[in-house]
Amino acid sequence: MKLFAELYLDEDVSALMATLLRARGFAVLTAHEAGMLAQDDPAQLSYAVQLERCIVTHNRVHFERLHAGYLRSGREHCGIIVAARRNHYELARRLGVLLNSLTADEIRNQLLYI
C-alpha cells in the first residue's frame, strides 16, 4: 500500500505545478517529461494507469466521461483529479491538502474535484 498518491500531470496542467508539488515532497511526472504530448485523453489516462499514478487535469468533461467508462467496464484507475484553473500556488496548496488527507488507496478509482 502506498501512503501518498504519485501524480501524472496531463499536458494542460502547467509544468510550474510539477515544480511546486515536488517542492512539497510529492512524486510528480508531467506529460511533457513522459513524451506524451499531443496524446488524446484516453491515452493519457491509460498511461497513468500503467504507471500507477493519479492523473491531474483541467479537462473536466472528457475525464468525467472516461471515469464513467472505466466504472461501467470494470476497469480501474489510480484516481482522477480535476483541477479548476486558478492561481498555480493556490492549486498546489489544494492538491497538497488533498494528497495529505487521502491515501493512494483512498484516491483509487475516484473522480475528485479541487
Predicted regions and their residues:
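Conserved BB-loop
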Residues: A27-Q39
